[in-house]
Amino acid sequence: VEGERIKEMMIQRKNMKYRLVFQGIIVGLVTGVVIVLNRILINKFSLLFNNFYSWGNKDLLKAILVIGILATIGIIVGIMVKQEGMISGSGIPQVKGRVINKLKMNWSRILIYKFIGGFLALSAGLSVGREGPSVQIGASIGEGVGEKNYKNMPVKKEFLITAGASAGLSAAFNSPLSGIIFALEEIHRNFSPLVLLTVMPAAITADFVTKRFLGIEPALTVGAMDALPLSYYWILIILGILTGIMGVIFSKGIYLFQDLYSKFKNIPQEVKIMIPFVLTAIIGLTAPMLLGGGHELILHLALEEKSILFLTIIYIVKFLLLLICFGSGVPGGIFLPMLLLGAIIGAIVGSFSIDVFGINSSYIINFIALGMAGYFASVVKAPITGIVLIMEMTGSFNHLLSLSVVVIISYVTSELLRNEPIYEVLLERLLKRVGLTKEESDSKKTILEFCIEMGSIGEGKFISEVHWPKGCLLVSIKRGEKEIIPTGNVKLIGGDYIVVLVNVDRRCFIIEEINKLTLV
């Protein structure tokens, strides 16, 4: 009977590819429409809030009214976070936790609350980004589609969650390739063909929808750049080291402010979230240039050269504003603010190089873009995504070499300083705070797929030599286009995909154990 069940599941797995492609398109279509609506509303209401701040700085009474209204909005958002804790922060750690089945979430509730909460925070001008919320909104839509089609097949549902996350980032940035790579490299941590089949149509469809309504330009672009001459590449070593170090400080700052907020247990959540709204009101009344996640500032840096002192002050202020906002738990991400800080570091190095080494001032844009990639690699530890994202922003592959140099040096610097990927750490902290959810205890089976990476413990071992975790059965090995029957004398080689049948109730444990075997 067990053999028949395995055979039936393998047949379903082969036929499932076409369904996943179609459902990936559906997820991308819905996510694209929702994110387009979100972006349009944020753009419209951001202008209203900016005008409101301009009106409020005319006299003291008006200013007090502005602060009072922002405080009220902060309390409303705080109540929403209190009612649905999973909408706090970026949302990317929550999606990662859901994909590995360590968190359970009410997708429809999160979709509504995150949309409204993120919209209010971003429209008001808080120093957070829309990319993280877009990823969580997309993942919620993916889970909703999966709930309708794969209620009793958790792995298939998680493919669609990953597809939704990819579509969300694609729609937020108008960068489909970045969305695909980010979902595979950061969310799913697996370049499985089945995942790719689901993620690609979702990201491309979401990008098509976004471009149809909002134009074909990337949401964040630094404009055309000339290729940096090889004679200047030694400066990239300095930039890589600096972005690596500053990225580590960024991560530590995020954790520090989360801890500071959590120490005040007697202060209600809505009051904590009110704090950044009040601070944003004061910033809007006095220095509106500092509002928002950083999109306008990045464009401003690319258009006009600034002094090193000015850039340093902007960096410190925006860094502190982000820490205060994100630490409170407000629904908003760190993705765009992180890119802004990297852009400022790049601008500082570029300005210094222009002043001291006499390089052409036109290359300041190169340093801004390279700074973003290096900072991203140091903080997120997803170097491929960092490179691809900046290439999509610049619309050119001519900068692959310079991007790779900065990203690798920044990544290695971050590794030497023992900096962990920020979304992994935020997930661990979230799990400690809420406690692990119990997995369903039943006898249901599901199929998982893992890639044997080159240099992993499993590479070069015979199947009979591997200590497979209890509750799993190796049913197939995919080597290129061939499918191999897994007997004890078959040797695993790098690039193999192993297909494993597991008990649903031990799924999370088995994933962790097999990842130790397959990942480097």
Predicted region positions:
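A structural signal for short secondary-structure junctions
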Residues: 368-369, 379-380, 442-444, 467-469, ...
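Short, solvent-exposed coil/turn segments
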Residues: 95, 443-445, 485
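Alpha-helical transmembrane segments and immediately membrane-proximal extracytoplasmic
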Residues: 1-435, 454, 479-481, 495, ...
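A common structural junction motif
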Residues: 515-520
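Intrinsic-disorder/low-complexity, polar/charged segments enriched in Ser/Thr/Lys/Arg/Asp/Glu/Gln
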Residues: 297, 445-449, 497
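A short, polar/charged loop/turn motif at coil->beta-strand junctions and beta-hairpin connectors
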Residues: 89, 116, 444, 468-471
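Extended boundary segments
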Residues: 425-464
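Cytosolic Rossmann-like ligand/nucleotide-binding regulatory domains
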Residues: 454-510
